[in-house]
């Protein structure tokens, strides 16, 4: 896998070099090498699901619904017991401190159930539960008004503990993992005041102090670590830093933060609140170090950026589970309000538009759950998560924002009450769009990841010709005004000789004919698929066993994803080297891939659920189809039928997504009792 990834990286890197962007090419090469190392560590030896759906061979439908199987099979009883005991603490007023932070009493309660060591091996004091169970726990805490708990613990067990499990020495594991399992907080400090989350540009650095057998950590001023969750006095922290002030090598170091700020003596240290509105119930800090001692043995060996990639795949999957839980908490509050509020012609919940918004929230929760558990199921079976881990996060966080807006439409001004649950959740809903990577940038990365193999194997010849055309006799890049970004009529008119040479080189390159042959074979294959597409899904051996209401959506999404291959080829032929800068069309392709993947994953997941859950899936799938194709009468009618079915289930309290949830009393109730 490592060798393959390194080869594949050359196409993207060489394209950037040919386009004259040498600095970005170097950064991309380093990042791809780090991703390659992470994949090798994970032994991800199976091609990613998203890539196979676009370029083939297609996965089985059993693989597409494997997330639902994992969710159904995991042990939930002990997790539910812990969550409900924690909820009781919240109702008793013991969950938060006077300044509305998670209390030590609540942490102790959760630790007594093993929550802080849920996925850690038993030899280090953990429960050795699966990451699918961590996703379930995160969703349950979030659904029951304790999203801050899921944020704290997910940070502990994904980014924090994963670095030690994947790259730490046995001595480091024995030292730190039992502390984490017992409830000691651990932060992962990457983000900086000056460079944000750009791992290749971190300015924090360490220098050797051989006399004292330690590193000296420096993070002053713009190098301060910022927005660091769980960074508290006395907590553990994994610090991303350069190994030398001007070094290109990035390292990772475990430290125990002092119990208080230190302003005098051998070193200086401070830990202050980040002053953010999101995650207000969590600890989130700005941390400064000057000449701070870090024992040599506390360095986690390995490329710090590689370790980050290794950990982030889990963080994005668990974030989706948190989105699912938060949307479920929204749904139970909105339904409680709509059942009591008088509207025109009766209770609000009688009307189609409020019910549609309720379906939007519930289907968003279902979608986020499906994405989370499929991603984790794929990860546990050695499938490369390229593409899927990214769209899992971006799609789930955007659905969360849509659900927030839907809740506000139904409940109106009461969602703005200072004590309302939605008021506390609102900044979190927006923050999830930028934490773990900003959504649009994630989508751009997703497109690159899932097309890398195809680019290397089929388009490398064209890129090589353009690179050669943009190199002078001495092997140096030509001036910007003489660069050929793409071969077209305009280029021939302005640079006819060089363009002719480039075209001759292209048709003389055997990879050009590999591309032509590939396109011909793909066209022939797609022609056959077009004929198959005329056969109704219910008569298809692939789709016939699925619930009838979902067959069309699985078929539609699979065909749409195959068409994305042609979309990508078209972008390359149109923009050529300019595609290294053409972010808008690449983002549009990324959004289309994301939407089609969501339709496919949601329909596949719901195919193994009850009828009401399937109705919610139909509601959301119909909406996503109309987002791609425009408003359609038949899809609108399917939505309305789904709303009716969900409404009947709500009357009977038969919506499984709401099981055991308790609504929060809404503000300014009109019934004194």
What is the predicted function of each stretch?
Residues 130-133, 162-165, 197-202, 230-234, ...:
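Short acidic, glycine/serine/threonine-rich loops at helix termini
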Residues 175-179, 191-209, 224-226:
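Beta-sandwich/jelly-roll carbohydrate-recognition scaffolds of carbohydrate-active enzymes
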Residues 149-171, 196-199, 339:
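N-terminal glycine-rich flavin-associated loop
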Residues 194-197, 227-230, 242-244, 275-283:
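Short Gly/Pro-enriched turn/cap motifs at secondary-structure boundaries
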Residues 214-268:
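A short core secondary-structure module
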Residues 124, 192-194, 210, 221, ...:
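Short, flexible loop/turn elements at secondary-structure junctions
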Residues 182-190:
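A short, Trp-centered hydrophobic/proline-enriched beta-strand micro-motif
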Residues 2-155, 174, 178, 182, ...:
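Flavin-dependent oxidoreductase catalytic core characteristic
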